[in-house]
Amino acid sequence: MSIGNIVQCIGAVVDIEFPRNAMPKVYDALVLEDSSETSFAEKGLTFEVQQQLGDGVVRTIALGSSDGLRRGMAVKNTEAPISVPVGQGTLGRIMDVLGRPIDEAGPIASDERRAIHQKAPKFDELSPSTDLLETGIKVIDLICPFAKGGKVGLFGGAGVGKTVNMMELINNIAKQHSGLSVFAGVGERTREGNDFYHEMKDSNVLDKVAMVFGQMNEPPGNRLRVALSGLTMAEKFRDEGRDILFFVDNIYRYTLAGTEVSALLGRMPSAVGYQPTLAEEMGKLQERITSTKTGSITSIQAVYVPADDLTDPSPATTFLHLDSTLVLSRDIAALGIYPAVDPLDSTSRQMDPQVVGQEHYNVARAVQQTLQRYKELRDIIAILGMDELSPEDKMAVNRARKIQRFLSQPFHVAEVFTGSPGKYVPLKETIRGFKMLVDGECDHLPEQAFYMVGSIDEAFEKAKKLQ
């Protein structure tokens, strides 16, 4: 194994010089040698080679804090890419980007390790799926149903409920699905990771979840690679013939970490200051999150939308790869309707009568038409008031307001904050409830009866109490 020396250190980007005949390959992992002069630096600090500059010099990203580094320090080439433990031993454990345990529960009992850089499955190995995955959340099951082995994006600005929605999905699917899950925390709050761990522990599903975290306080190198570490663990389970759930919170921070180091690596920035390799980096990650003939990966990804602008290059690049897009709206959150999913902006490739069935399709489209009509009439109502509307329009507005409220639902994971018990609504109940609403069978009920209830029967009971 060849030894090199640090020649330049700018933030997270470090240049290291090796003998010309022993230059490391791109993506090789390099490790800081232990010596008296490295006492102030992070012990066993790992670097990943990004570029070969020539004359034996390579440009690397530090996967850890570069505090305490200085020129001349010795670095060893491991002659292999970064690898993480995979298999049964990772379940119930919390790991960092390098697969080291951070839950103080001893070493990880796994003999096998896999490199985090893998090729995407070949075209002939892929297996598309049309089986629906029931989530128990009305607005999702009705408007943008998920497919087993599909990819879902939760799009939303700051504070509209991406993480809470994801927690509820994990809570509902991981418990109902009783399969294995991998959670990758990419550049999010450490508190949320802690909450997630305890949530899983209290629900007794911790032994079915592997967790990898590279949170907000960590250097960009960790945040850039932690999604790949989590994905590598999920791929191992898929290749064993299992159906896996892969959660990523938040995919935008993965892009952002790439942006942070891109300029330091000497690349010209592209639109809005993003790295020029944005589409390639996203494609490399997303193409690996797929289902093969041996097993499936169903992935649910939270996507932060900067300044609520869906045309920003980062969310726009993510859109291309998804089967279902769940758009969270600040306007709906402002009305106090949670989950704040926008039923007119959210889409799903599964919303096809041949996949979901004719009745489901008709009800979902009728709900969207009613809400769209209400949206169009809103300006007229604001200027002239309700009295100027035709009887048909008045009826459409009243139904739309009831539908809007019926799309809200109390969550299990929010019980602590709201005090109202969470509700899981089966798909059949969801379709029945909205069918009654659009058919006018609930026109006599007050709209307050539909707010924060589970099934339509609960709305009828609530209406009796309100009278």
UniProtKB/Swiss-Prot annotation:
Source organism of the structure: Cupriavidus pinatubonensis (strain JMP 134 / LMG 1197) (Cupriavidus necator (strain JMP 134))
Gene, per the UniProt record: atpD
GO molecular function: ATP binding; ATP hydrolysis activity; proton-transporting ATP synthase activity, rotational mechanism
Similarity comment: Belongs to the ATPase alpha/beta chains family.
Identification of the protein by name: ATP synthase subunit beta
Lineage, top ranks: Bacteria, Pseudomonadati, Pseudomonadota, Betaproteobacteria, Burkholderiales
Subcellular location: Cell inner membrane
Membrane topology field: Peripheral membrane protein
Subunit structure: F-type ATPases have 2 components, CF(1) - the catalytic core - and CF(0) - the membrane proton channel. CF(1) has five subunits: alpha(3), beta(3), gamma(1), delta(1), epsilon(1). CF(0) has three main subunits: a(1), b(2) and c(9-12). The alpha and beta chains form an alternating ring which encloses part of the gamma chain. CF(1) is attached to CF(0) by a central stalk formed by the gamma and epsilon chains, while a peripheral stalk is formed by the delta and b chains.
Pfam family, one: ATP-synt_ab_N
PROSITE patterns per the UniProt record, alphabetical: ATPASE_ALPHA_BETA (PS00152)
Gene Ontology cellular component annotations, sorted alphabetically: plasma membrane; proton-transporting ATP synthase complex
